Amino acid sequence: MKLNLHFAFFVTDYFIQENKIKYLYLMNYIKKLQQSDEFEYCEGATSEEIQIVETSLGVLLPEVYVKFLSECGSCNFGDTYINGVYKEDGILSYPIIELTKQLREELNLPDDFIVLNYEIDEYLILYKVSKTDHLNDSKVYDAEIHCNKDGNFVMSKPTLLFNSFDEYFEDFLELADDY
């Protein structure tokens, strides 16, 4: 019994440490990009503001994305954005809610996706979320938007782009390295 209990503590401690490392990893990148003139970010979202996002969209946000929101709300590098909660100089808006709801209505975006980034006529980046489970992280997808023969915009089936938000964020950071 002691061996099993010891193993359980070891495994639990390992997962706690792994999550702390992932969070520090994300924070270190944000600090790195704060030094760039091209990187713009907002004030971090409060837990109440994050709850508004979840309630408004009827989803539970993955923990990694919650940590991102609490660190910098939303951000951009040049003309590439990661949507979230915009909070700066007393102005508060929720582009993640607005854009996700708009595309749910206009394109029948499934309820288990939120819109991380959308550039009209270029690309749509989606983050898989759950309505019932608090996930640690989830997959990031892209989808194409095109006009059908009736003149209506339609969305293609989402295809896997990254296995995690962390991978997506790393790709975002490469913009700074390439700049």
Predicted regions located by residue number:
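Short Gly/Pro-enriched loop/turn and capping motifs at secondary-structure junctions
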Residues: 121-123, 132, 147-148
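A surface-exposed partner-binding patch
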Residues: 22-125, 175-179
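Alpha-helix N-cap recognition
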Residues: 157-171
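N-terminal amphipathic/basic-hydrophobic helices that include classical n-h-c signal peptides
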Residues: 1-25
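A short alpha->loop->secondary-structure connector
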Residues: 131-137
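Compact, glycine/acidic-enriched structural inserts
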Residues: 146-151, 156
